[in-house]
């Protein structure tokens, strides 16, 4: 994927959620609902502070994150893959193995 986010932006690929119906049928994709977990594919250089300094982001490529799927999250299709573009502040947590 050839994309470089700017500033404090992060590119995330949503992880598909798998769940089961009451009858035990495995649901995936839209039937299971949208996951708020994903893998970080790319990160920007960092947030520009009032002093002009750049503060590096806490997340890195490969991190599995839980994010707020709200107003500021933009969905884009890049190289036939759907990705999310968000600010680091939209990320709520990093899932540690």
Curated annotation (Swiss-Prot):
Localisation per UniProt entry: Cytoplasm
Biological processes, Gene Ontology terms: chaperone cofactor-dependent protein refolding
Domain of life assignment: Bacteria
CDD domains membership: cpn10
Gene3D superfamilies: GroES chaperonin
SMART domains (alphabetical): Cpn10
InterPro entries: Chaperonin_GroES, Chaperonin_GroES_sf, Chaprnonin_Cpn10_CS, GroES-like_sf
Family under the similarity heading: Belongs to the GroES chaperonin family.
Record's subunit section: Heptamer of 7 subunits arranged in a ring. Interacts with the chaperonin GroEL.
PANTHER family: 10 KDA HEAT SHOCK PROTEIN (PTHR10772), CO-CHAPERONIN GROES (PTHR10772:SF58)
Protein name as it appears in the record: Co-chaperonin GroES
Biological classification of the source: Bacteria, Pseudomonadati, Pseudomonadota, Gammaproteobacteria, Enterobacterales
